[in-house]
Swiss-Prot record:
Coiled coil: none annotated. The keyword DNA damage does not apply. It is found in: Cytoplasm. The keyword Nuclease applies. GO terms for molecular function: magnesium ion binding; RNA binding; RNA-DNA hybrid ribonuclease activity. The gene is rnhC. Residues 86-300 form the RNase H type-2 domain. One of its GO terms (cellular component) is ribonuclease H2 complex. This is Ribonuclease HIII. It catalyses: Endonucleolytic cleavage to 5'-phosphomonoester. NCBIfam families: rnhC (TIGR00716). Belongs to the RNase HII family. RnhC subfamily. Pfam families: DUF3378 (PF11858), RNase_HII (PF01351). It comes from the Bacteria.
Amino acid sequence: MPSSFVSQLSPSLFSILREQLEKKGFTISIPPHTVFQGRSPTVSCTVYQSGKIVVQGKGTQEFVEFFLEPEILQTFSSQNVQQDLRSRIGVDESGKGDFFGPLCTAGVYASSPQAIEALYKTSICDSKLIPDAKILSLAQNIRSLCACKVITLFPEKYNALYANFQNLNSLLAWTHATIIDNLAPHPAGAVFAISDQFASSERVLLQAVRKKRSDIELIQRHRAEQDVVVAAASILAREAFLSSIHALESQYQIRLLKGASGKVKQRAKEILHNKGQVVLEKVCKTHFKTFNEVLGSGNQ
């Protein structure tokens, strides 16, 4: 699919689409001659007063095939994804860009064509395109179809490991390699693993995997979440992140925000003031520059 998509949208769907985009974290604006425009880091979706809808950006294909057509337009005219039914392990993570909360890495081993076909039929896609409220039910479906493994590093453990690795990509490589080692059959045979290439060099993850297993093929690619098994892993990782955030909120009686925005920084200042540095360190990733900025403002 090209990096743009044009269709016609019924006025009755305007508010539904806008509401769904807001739930997905899109930034909403109203440029001239439009009903509204939603923007994310990878795609823009513009609805004009005429009813024309224009989607643009590198994330167009995923957005249209996995969200706009099945959930809003309820058509499937452009969905031409050829199903890859080879047995494989998909790995993905959630939380690495969030100041609060854990780093969660998940793996899914789809061991049969039947399991993979079921994932396609469940409309599994990258968790970033799915509202949080839908993540739980999808995760339950995935667990009923495939072998799964999740590693959740709560902030206290994460911060200790980061101090040891001194590099986020090295830490990610370790969690990914551990997941692959746990899920891969012995011997691996024709089963392979697929992951997003999160480091500038493929060697980072490859070396971590080879320390544990020498018999499994590893495929790394940018935007690996387009693969249905990796997308399934992204959903499990997101579910683990969301449930862990809720657990931390309950344990420390605080409200945590996602991301690393100015609002997140302000919330960190409030936690520091109300609960103290010890609690702040137990709910955040201390290598983020936000942490030192918050401590500095607290000492003024």
